[in-house]
Amino acid sequence: MMSKIDLDISNLPDTTISVREVFGIDTDLRVPAYSKGDAYVPDLDPDYLFDRETTLAILAGFAHNRRVMVSGYHGTGKSTHIEQVAARLNWPCVRVNLDSHVSRIDLVGKDAIVVKDGLQVTEFKDGILPWAYQHNVALVFDEYDAGRPDVMFVIQRVLESSGRLTLLDQSRVIRPHPAFRLFATANTVGLGDTTGLYHGTQQINQAQMDRWSIVTTLNYLPHDKEVDIVAAKVKGFTADKGRETVSKMVRVADLTRAAFINGDLSTVMSPRTVITWAENAHIFGDIAFAFRVTFLNKCDELERALVAEHYQRAFGIELKECAANIVLEATA
């Protein structure tokens, strides 16, 4: 006979915050939040810049218990966006990377041998899903489209906002905590990878995709906004001259993305790559060398001349990988 777990409903949001004041978005929306955080609340990044549409989608997930998926290219800050919203709401947040080694047992739980009163006994230990389901936690599944099929069907049980989680091994039915929230990030929106960039991803059952009540896309930002983000993250580039340098860096990234879309490049610079490049430039004191070790060396050898040409167009400086230099070396 199934036993139902009646939760002690506590740890509910005890305040509300103004989206306009906290996130700088022009709306009258107010969102429930906690006045105090705990150990599971992400660290707050005071310089983080929010994308309007993505932020509103995530806030709707917190305020109205919507299941929200954030899709987009790598390095655009999908998971970080969710974390930084949670940080400002003081909402506990836990991320789980759905790589191919995460199994059903990891999510649901398993029998473990424990010592009680000096004796070894077998006891069921909840996995991350039952634990989060019973607490005021925002659970984020990263790389959602890389999850194994058996794992995905376990998750499907909890995608409905009032869905109950049945643990067959324990004959238990778990009701969700009213402040439990579920998010996911993905590169392919469950349709499979057509670019060749995301090996290991797969198509997601459309019956499951249909249960995600909000799907938002976070792709590459407009040039000036990306410059703002990089300059805010890397303090050494905040002056006018530094901002001009960052603008050239983002220009290189824009050129690689255009080449990728046209099919001329198989790799692409993400906003994360630009930030890493700026950080490495600050470490080495050499923008060209930092570019080489941050991105250029990751490119196919046959494509490096094109990437070096993008650098030359933005900075007006030739790298040794430029096609002209390669020809000169070959004829020398």
UniProtKB/Swiss-Prot annotation:
Query: So which residues are the signal peptide here?
Result: none
Keyword set includes ATP-binding: yes
Q: What does this protein do?
A: Catalyzes cobalt insertion in the corrin ring.
Mind telling me which Pfam families this protein's record contains? AAA_5, CobS_N
One annotated GO molecular function is: cobaltochelatase activity
Q: Name one GO biological process term.
A: cobalamin biosynthetic process
Q: Which reaction does it catalyse?
A: hydrogenobyrinate a,c-diamide + Co(2+) + ATP + H2O = cob(II)yrinate a,c diamide + ADP + phosphate + 5 H(+)
User: Where can this protein be found?
Assistant: Cytoplasm
Give the top-level enzyme category.
Answer: ligase
Pathway named in the protein's UniProt entry = Cofactor biosynthesis; adenosylcobalamin biosynthesis; cob(II)yrinate a,c-diamide from precorrin-2 (aerobic route): step 10/10
Give the main localization category: cytoplasm
Quick one: a GO cellular component term?
A: cytoplasm
Would you tell me the protein name for this molecule?
Aerobic cobaltochelatase subunit CobS
This enzyme's EC code(s): 6.6.1.2
The encoding gene is cobS
What are the alphabetically sorted keywords of the record? Answer: ATP-binding, Cobalamin biosynthesis, Cytoplasm, Ligase, Nucleotide-binding, Porphyrin biosynthesis
User: Self-association or partners: how does it assemble?
Assistant: Heterotrimer of CobN, CobS and CobT.
